[in-house]
Amino acid sequence: MSDRHYDLGMGDHDRLQKELGGGIPRGAIVLIEGDYGAGKSVISQRFSYGLTQEDALVTLISTELDTRGFLDQMHSLEYEMVKPLLNEEFLFIAAEIDSGGSILSGGDDNDRKDLLRRLMEAETLWEADVVIVDTFDAILRNDPKFEALVRQNEERQAALEIIGFFRDV
């Protein structure tokens, strides 16, 4: 790791680190946009693997995969993540969201509906050097408080509060 960037590793495997100017700047908030099926999750998985190979502590929150699905996907990409998981160098959190907007496990009904607050208050996941959320919009779409702000045309204020939180972390 350099003083200014988190190295993405695998320089002999692909050009990602070079194409991104030497890695991910420390303290950066990075947003990856694209259509459904464009490969955003695979890029997140590539970041996770490369960063852990370069000794960064990484948390990946996925609204799309459970732990088994994640490990199978990583294995198919030849990114072995079992050792980093067992060594606590990598934290994978499956945020399984059902069609009703609830996280499927844990908490009472009120907690399960307040997804964004629960994410922000989960201190352990923010202890990593790099935190990746795949897919953040699923959490926002299913959070009633964020949804209420959008209905009141206050989405800009909600976005500023979220960005402010991430900057403080």
Regions found by a protein language model. Name each.
Residues 43, 66, 115, 162-165:
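Residue-level preference for nonpolar/small residues embedded in alpha-helices
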Residues 35-36, 59, 107-108, 154-155:
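A generic structural signal for short
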Residues 12, 16, 20, 112-123, ...:
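Generic hydrophobic alpha-helical segments
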Residues 56-145, 149:
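Conserved inter-motif catalytic segment of the P-loop NTP-binding fold
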Residues 1-77:
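The Walker A/P-loop phosphate-binding site
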Residues 151-169:
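Substrate-engagement module of ASCE P-loop NTPases
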Residues 9-13, 40-41, 109-113, 156-159:
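A conditional alpha-helix N-cap/helix-loop micro-motif detector
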